[in-house]
């Protein structure tokens, strides 16, 4: 058993031969109770990891085997591990060795906070510490800290959350896992028809009914904003490009702010009367502009999608 195995009892790694699981990543999220494991798990899930909460260590290997042998498109698994039970230390040591044999890259994230901060957090939610067992709150915290001491020393990433907000913790996680803070926001743009209801899940709603309606042009009526004749008609209309110029600038400013505030998904809706022509064309046009800025953008057409499903 190498040094890391001895420390988790101790979390070890060693080079192994290639296997179907080679290249798969496992992140173990652990640390002091009240230090922010749940918040960390949510942020890590936003980074594209498949997150499992309260995972017994001995179930990790079967789960990785299932994911890598079933052709799953999941390649990164984050598991919130509760290792307060001393038996779990032995389980975790054996599991890490087995994952190493499979060629899985494993890392341990340990979240910590000062005793004073942990006490304030527990008092604010009026819940007992899991190891308190009728004793003082500080006794439970000290017992857990002693139990996790070796694990913390051999963790790959240690974050003290004592003075961090949720947003700051998320930024720290990005830096620790990806090497940089969150700088991009994923954008989803969709079109809709006002006569079918205003969407309630959009961050921005643009009303483009001020543009001429292709519906009243006989040769365009049966087409949609995805068709070039309709798109050309809409975008060449007076005010269309000017509107897109202004809207693009406003959205770009907002996206920069969202990234700083740890908001990584933005939904923009374009509405016209029926959701077939103008809103579709304008959605596609804005998507093209934002992609040129290097943003990840997806586009959908609510009313057209409904029609296709019927």
UniProtKB/Swiss-Prot annotation:
Q: Which UniProt keywords apply?
A: ATP-binding, GTP-binding, Nucleotide-binding
- State where GTP binds: 82-85
What does the record list as coiled-coil region(s)?
none
- Which GO molecular function entries does the Swiss-Prot or TrEMBL record give? ATP binding; GTP binding
**Pfam families in the record:** PapZ_C (PF22740), RapZ-like_N (PF03668)
Q: Report the transmembrane regions from the record.
A: none
Positions contributing to ATP binding: 31-38
- Known NCBIfam families for this protein? PRK05416.1
Q: Describe the family membership recorded for this protein in Swiss-Prot or TrEMBL.
A: Belongs to the RapZ-like family.
Function according to Swiss-Prot or TrEMBL: Displays ATPase and GTPase activities.
Task: Extract the PANTHER family matched here.
Answer: RNASE ADAPTER PROTEIN RAPZ
This one is known as Nucleotide-binding protein BAD_0837
Q: Which organism is it from?
A: Bifidobacterium adolescentis (strain ATCC 15703 / DSM 20083 / NCTC 11814 / E194a)
């Amino acid at each position: 058993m190498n040094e890391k195995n001895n420390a988790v009892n101790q979390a070890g790694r060693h080079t192994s031969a290639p296997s179907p699981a080679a290249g798969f990543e496992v992140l173990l999220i652990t640390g002091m109770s009240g230090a922010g494991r749940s918040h960390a798990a949510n942020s890590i899930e936003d980074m594209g990891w498949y997150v499992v909460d309260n995972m017994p260590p001995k179930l990790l290997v079967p789960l990785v085997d299932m994911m890598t042998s079933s052709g799953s498109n999941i390649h990164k698994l984050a598991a919130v591990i509760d290792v307060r039970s001393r038996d779990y230390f032995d389980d975790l040591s054996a599991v890490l060795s087995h994952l190493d044999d499979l060629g899985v890259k494993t890392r341990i994230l340990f979240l910590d906070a000062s005793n004073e901060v942990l006490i304030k957090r527990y008092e604010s939610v009026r819940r007992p510490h899991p190891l308190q067992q009728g004793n003082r709150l500080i006794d439970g915290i000290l017992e857990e800290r002693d139990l996790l001491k070796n694990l913390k020393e051999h963790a790959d990433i240690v974050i003290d959350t004592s003075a961090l907000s949720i947003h700051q913790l998320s930024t720290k996680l990005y830096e620790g896992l990806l090497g940089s803070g969150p700088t991009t926001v994923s954008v989803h743009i969709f079109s809709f028809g006002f006569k079918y209801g205003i969407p309630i899940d959009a961050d921005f709603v643009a009303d483009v009914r001020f543009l001429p309606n292709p519906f009243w042009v006989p040769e365009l009526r049966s087409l949609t904003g995805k068709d070039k004749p309709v798109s050309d008609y809409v975008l060449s209309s007076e005010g269309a490009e000017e509107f897109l110029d202004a809207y693009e600038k406003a959205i770009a400013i907002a996206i920069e702010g969202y990234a700083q505030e740890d908001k990584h998904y933005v939904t923009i809706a374009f509405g016209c009367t029926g959701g077939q022509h103008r809103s579709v064309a304008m959605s596609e046009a804005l998507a093209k502009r934002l992609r040129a800025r290097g943003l990840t953008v997806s586009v959908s057409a609510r009313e057209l999608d409904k029609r296709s499903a019927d």
